[in-house]
Amino acid sequence: MARPKKRSKTKKILFAVEIIVLLVFIGGLYVYGQLMSRMDKTNTQKLDTQKVQVNEEVQDAINSEDSHLTGYTTYALFGIDSRSANMKFSGNQNSDTMIIASVNNDTKEVKLVSIYRDTLLNLGNDTYSKANAAYAYGGPEQAITMLNTNLDLNITDYATVKFDALATIIDDLGGLDMDMSYAEIVHMNNYCVETAEDTGLSYTPIELPEKPEDQEKVQYSYHLNGVQATSYCRIRYTASLDMGRTERQRKVIQMIVYKAKHAGLSKIFNIMDDVFPMVTTSLGKEDILQLLPTLIGYSIDETAGFPSSYKFSNVKGSIIVPTDLVSNVQELHKFLYGDANYTPSATVTANSEKILEIVGGASNLDDVQTNIGEENTANDTVIFENDGSGWTDTSGSGEQYDTDNSGDTSGGEDNTYVPDDNTGGNDYIDDSTGGDD
């Protein structure tokens, strides 16, 4: 009589396993359905691949599978100002946050590099300006072309986020614990007024501690909500300038990723509901779904800023000049891809030489930025072009820009130069409408 009992026990175990598998399957279908329904909230904007350029040497190496880039996937992340009423993801505003994300496909290691917004680079068609102006010239295609051709990259996908998305996701995650300096507290409180107005979210000003002798020393700890943490990311008038601003942004991104990885499913769904409408990406539903399961295994281990070696040229305020672009690109590829012997392309070499020509040579550069504060006209656009007689700043001409090198400057809003009368200078629609920016 023992055998039938044994078989009965075995059947019960198998039945229990089948129930568990069925529940997991149903749960998987539920999660899949929830994810798919939320994917519709993102703004999918495929890149016009005809407008995205890659340097010839880089493309040849990729085609021959003889490139260190083949083991990695590289994305461009852009942050744009959400304060303008006519703000569009496609262009007409500067991308004041530009981050390169390199993903090692084998180790799942992620590295982030911020491009300093005032870095003088070739935006395309031998027109040189601050890096953050590329997005205003021709949307994500032009911004990615700038990154690819100046830095020898092969970026084919991107995501653009409105700044108020940052405040929203931080609030959804319950805020962030941040160590700050006295100077950062002062500037953060100032930015909070405008950030709260722009996002419609609330905050409580942090009461200033007694002013210390060293105002730049990080020695105070606070729990920041979305408005406060976003304002913290906007600070660029401490001694560390834009380098400190981008470092703060990368720090906040790392903290968000860590908290999101440890959040429950309901909280993740809530974040998707709130934030996805504020995101535009070239990635389709299936692309995003393929990324989501592996995100748990990813870790942001290292971050940096670009250029790593730079000086300042005080043109209409201040611009950051790579010294020189070739060596900076070598360091970039060493950091992102582990290639210590990378030889930059002829395009990078030519751009490097032209950048130094524009600023009058390395001897005209300063080790420090001379103007710090609201009086600094770093928001003013500089557009350097060479008509054969030398480099001149044509930013005051109000002319249109040939984004695709076709000879046509009348092809729609991506080509249109927009003067901003708010600053007394000629700007693209930017963060120059008030506040500390």
Cite the ranges covered by each PLM segment.
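Entry/capping segment at the start of metal-dependent catalytic domains
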Residues: A2-K108
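C-terminal solvent-exposed extensions
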Residues: V54-E65, Y72, N86, F269, ...
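Flexible, polar/acidic helix-loop-strand segments at domain edges
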Residues: D66, T70-G71, D171-K267, G411, ...
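Extracytoplasmic
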Residues: T70-T73, Q93-M98, T107-I115, D126, ...
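Structured segments of extracytoplasmic/periplasmic soluble domains
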Residues: F78, S84, D118, T145-N154, ...
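Second-shell loop/turn segments in exported
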Residues: S84-S90, Y128-Y137, D152-D157, Q219, ...
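Extracytoplasmic/secreted envelope proteins and their assembly/folding machinery
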Residues: T97, Y128, P140-N148, F163-A167, ...
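Amphipathic, coiled-coil-like alpha-helical scaffolding segments used for oligomerization/assembly
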Residues: Y137-I206, S282-G284
